[in-house]
Amino acid sequence: HALHPETPMHFFWDKQDADEVTKVDATLSFHQIDDVKFLNRMAGCRAYASTAGFESICEAMYLSKPVLMVPAHIEQDCNAYDARQAGAGIIGESFDLESLLRFAGTYVPNREFIRWVRSCERQIIGELERLADQHSAVTVPTLTNYFPI
């Protein structure tokens, strides 16, 4: 933050005794975790930095936001690797705002991912209809169900 004081930064945390919003200065704020507020902030941001949690990286990809991922454990390492392969962003050893801003300048969103997400309702309904068709055939009970042989 000290190197880029002009860049607004919003962080979300679950600090027990903190206010709803802790404003450090004009461009640095900490917010209590709130799903709706988080997504609204992400929708309006220029770029996103994360420890590479699966959901937030997918949300950033859907919203066409470049991502800096700094994984903290093995599951996040795997998420970061997959996300980088999908074009979501870059992986760093630390939260380096300069790297994120530089990447944001060249970022190209993965439009195929967005199309895939938007197709999920159609795919799910199609699969449910296919399964319903398989199970809707009339079965006629055999006599062995009623009389022991």
Q: Whereabouts are the PLM-identified features?
A:
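C-terminal amphipathic helix plus adjacent low-complexity
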Residues: 102-149
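Short acidic active-site motifs
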Residues: 36-38, 99, 123
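Nucleotide-sugar donor-binding patch of glycosyltransferase catalytic domains
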Residues: 66-108
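A donor-sugar binding/catalytic signature common to diverse glycosyltransferases
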Residues: 37-79
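Short amphipathic alpha-helical segments and helix-helix/interface helices
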Residues: 1-2, 39, 80, 125-128
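Donor-nucleotide binding loops and adjacent catalytic segments primarily
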Residues: 1-47
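Anion (oxyanion) recognition and catalysis
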Residues: 3-5, 61, 84
